[in-house]
């Protein structure tokens, strides 16, 4: 009797998993559908470009320099680096490269804790229209902010950019990460976007408008996967995460 019950449970789980994979596969096919580009718009959006950084002295300046080379009016964006729990010269390197610094006041256990303070004390208090989030080891394409401006001006309140790899051939690990990024872009975010469904915020290179952040009561993630949690919060409040493949960042 026990073996029969276990067999039925395994069978049921296998059927459910198979149905999920069938659904995922059907949706993924739409990743090959040609999509219309977001209309180009004159620069209007004032961005806060935010990066939480812990012991990132070796790479943080590269991020800041790539942001300073944006094809976007410099008066319409600020670069804010929030060093936290550092034992190296991250703050000094970021400031020397041209970033503004924000020193978190509370106890920091995760990236979400940093974003909570930055959103409350900088993004919303500073009158920015939107926040772009980056990781300290990212490089940002020169047209990133211009293309995010297009998406925001088109009415999107949460936007995930195209997360690419800057070192796919360096090692087996970096190669696997690169394949993961490419598959996520093509078979998940691009496919779901083609169907009018919500994309997935994945780590960095994403934008959230100040209006959305106010509606959510600030940044309120509590898990270590703050990107997925934020995506869920958007879905629960009826907001779709858009995908903007023309806004490109390069991750390490």
What are these regions (language model features)?
Residues 65-76:
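Short, acidic, metal-binding catalytic loop of nucleotide-sugar glycosyltransferases
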Residues 1-43, 96:
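N-terminal membrane-anchoring/stem segments of glycan-assembly enzymes
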Residues 83-91, 106-108, 139:
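A conserved acidic beta->alpha catalytic loop
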Residues 45-48, 78, 229:
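Cell-envelope/extracellular polymer assembly enzymes that use nucleotide-activated donors
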Residues 103, 110-114, 118-126, 142-223:
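Long helical/loop segments within the catalytic core of UDP-sugar-dependent glycosyltransferases
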Residues 222, 231-249:
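Catalytic donor-sugar/metal-binding loop of nucleotide-sugar-dependent glycosyltransferases
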Residues 125-139:
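Short beta-strand-to-loop acidic/aromatic patch adjacent to the donor-nucleotide binding site
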